[in-house]
Regions:
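Short, hydrophobic transmembrane alpha-helix segments
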Residues: 32-46
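Polar-ligand-bearing catalytic/cofactor-coordination segments
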Residues: 1-26, 42, 49-51, 58-202, ...
């Protein structure tokens, strides 16, 4: 699924993206079949409900996909910036895109002090790379470290994993709408249609809710597994493109430290974009359960991989004194 660029291909990522979409598709089809079967058994008007839900769900999914870049920028309070407004940022991205032989995405800046970055868009032609003012002006990144962050984000565009994450999330949205239509249909109309079969309606809604919970849990875990791997793939590809894994190590460390200094309330407001961020907008606590459901691999795991890449490139290992 990777675009034709000089970013190192990642077969593991391609396999995982394909498997995730296939499994999510199967889960979605099975869920629709479950709703139809349950409502048919209860003599409810399943066909009309499914049709209406698919129309509304498909429409909202299409709008969300088509305007995914604008929606993400609005959520971040970001605006696009021209080369005149952000010459250094554009200069670094120009060099990286030339090095990777890929189309340059639009660039945007978010006014938040949270140090972070993300890439989004329905395809490479409509991609946008957004960085925060916190990353540009308050994280103390060197130019090489900022270049490492941007190379990581451009890798997501080149590998097309941003698109897969968007598609996967939309399937969950449509499934949720199916449940709502089924629920409200039976809540407000089921008893009148079924006469003395109200006990069937009472049983139908909990079963649909249970099916919904199972679908959500499976979708959640599949998306989280893909999300964590794609971050490792972007770290690796970005480090290999720049040939400077140590700069990315330093950037990860500085950004994570900067996030830990952000008030918890501000971090919560950034949660909707967590899956797309360079580093998760959460405070590091080392809790095992939190790591299982995390959108990103642990900082230690990411740094360990980059240290191994340093050795592969024949570069010195990590500085025992910490950041250089």
């Amino acid at each position: 699924m990777a675009a034709r660029t000089r970013y190192a291909p990642d077969r593991g990522l391609t396999v995982r993206m394909t498997a995730t979409m296939f499994l999510l598709g199967l889960v979605f089809v099975a869920f629709v079949a479950l709703i139809i079967g349950l409502m048919t058994a209860a003599h409810a008007s399943a066909g009309a409900i499914i049709l209406v839900a698919l129309i509304f769900g498909g429409g909202s999914a299409f709008v969300s996909l088509f305007y995914s870049d604008k929606i993400a920028l609005a959520a971040a309070g970001a605006r696009e910036v021209s080369p005149r407004e952000a010459p250094e940022l554009h200069g670094i991205v120009d060099r990286l895109c030339a090095l990777a032989d890929m189309d340059k995405p639009r660039l945007a800046v978010s006014p938040t002090r949270l140090p972070n970055a993300f890439a989004t868009g329905r395809n490479s032609k409509h991609a946008v790379l957004c960085v925060t003012e916190g990353l540009l002006y308050h994280s103390n990144l060197t130019q090489e470290e900022l270049e490492g962050v941007l190379a990581h984000e451009l890798s997501h565009v080149a590998h097309k994993d941003v698109q897969v994450m968007t598609y996967a999330s939309l399937l969950a949205i449509v499934a949720g709408l199916l449940v709502r239509f089924a629920f409200y249909s039976e809540l407000f109309g089921g008893g009148r249609r079924m006469g003395n079969n109200n006990s069937q309606a009472a049983l139908l809604i909990p079963l649909i809710m249970l099916g919904s919970a199972v679908v959500y849990a499976i979708s959640f875990l599949l998306i989280r597994l893909l999300s964590r791997y794609r971050e490792l793939a972007a770290d690796r590809s970005g480090a290999l493109l720049t040939q400077n894994p140590s700069a990315l190590i330093n950037a990860l460390t500085k950004v994570s430290q900067g996030i830990n200094r952000i008030p918890t309330q501000d971090l919560r407001s950034a949660e909707p974009l967590n899956a797309f961020f360079f580093a998760p907008a959460v405070k590091l606590n080392g809790k095992t359960l939190a790591n299982i459901f995390a959108t990103h691999p642990s900082l230690e795991k990411r740094i360990d991989q980059l240290n191994k890449i340093q050795l592969e490139l024949g570069q010195p290992g990590p500085d025992p004194r910490g950041l250089r």
